[in-house]
Amino acid sequence: MKLQNKTIIITGGSKGLGVSMAEECAREGARVVITARSLGELQTVADKIRAAGGRVEPMQADMARPEELEALITKTLEVFGSIDGLINNAGINYVKPFLEIDPREWQRVLDVDLNGAFRLTQLCARQMHRAGHGGSIVQIASVHTHASLAGAAPYDAAKCGVVGFSKAAAVELAAYGIRVNILSPGLCETEIWKDIVAAAPSEKECLDYWKANIPGQRLITPLEVAKCCVFLLSNDSSCITGANIFADLGMTSLLISREPYASKNINASEA
């Protein structure tokens, strides 16, 4: 097992990608701490993991409240005795035209997605440094750190900020055996996809559009993202730090979607 007896904290662990991350880390032998703003859904996830033989502890924590993040660290050490890894997965977003963004909405996104991620990264890194055994931190960012969509300014600002401080942290913490990497997923089969489909004329039309913009011609799955996280948390990636890895089936490498007039139909002449 790749994460045997390692204690891994996973934020946003009550739904979507966080659930798959928690399940996969537990399958790989980790002692998992899952967090979210409320305990209700966390408990359901924890019950499922325990039923499969995994070790997990649900803990309430709001990423925008520094005192709750400090309490999370304290309780994790009380329950499991160490912190070996962190997946900063929690995040929120308000989709709104740039000219209509409310400063309070802007601040709320940054408080959770950027400031909360920074605080928890720092708290975990301090504990890893004190313990002297190193560790691995994985920040869940987005393809939005490479390119944008209309209405995503607060989210984009936060995720690009996460990439920035994580690279700086990776440089400083490498000497202590602490690795910091960023995983930027593309379009994934989660609740967000359901929201996208709900706003489209039809599911088929929506899927056809996105397939045309993804070289792999499908959505990525939560399990695929979770397996990437396990790799980055494990010793298999011991030489990787400061990287922003795009798990997007080639989405960010595509210049323009497939069209009848795309480059494959153009015969270049010699200059």
Task: List PLM regions with ranges.
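Conserved glycine-rich cofactor-binding loop
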Residues: 12-16
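Alpha-helical segment proximal to the catalytic Tyr-Lys
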Residues: 126, 171-175, 238
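Short C-terminal tail/terminal secondary-structure segment
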Residues: 230, 241-271
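Active-site helix of classical SDR
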Residues: 121, 158, 166
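C-terminal substrate-recognition "lid" of short-chain dehydrogenase/reductases
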Residues: 218-247
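Residue(s) in the substrate-gating loop at a strand-loop-helix junction
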Residues: 142
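Substrate-binding pocket helix/loop in short-chain dehydrogenase/reductase
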Residues: 97-98, 102-110, 210
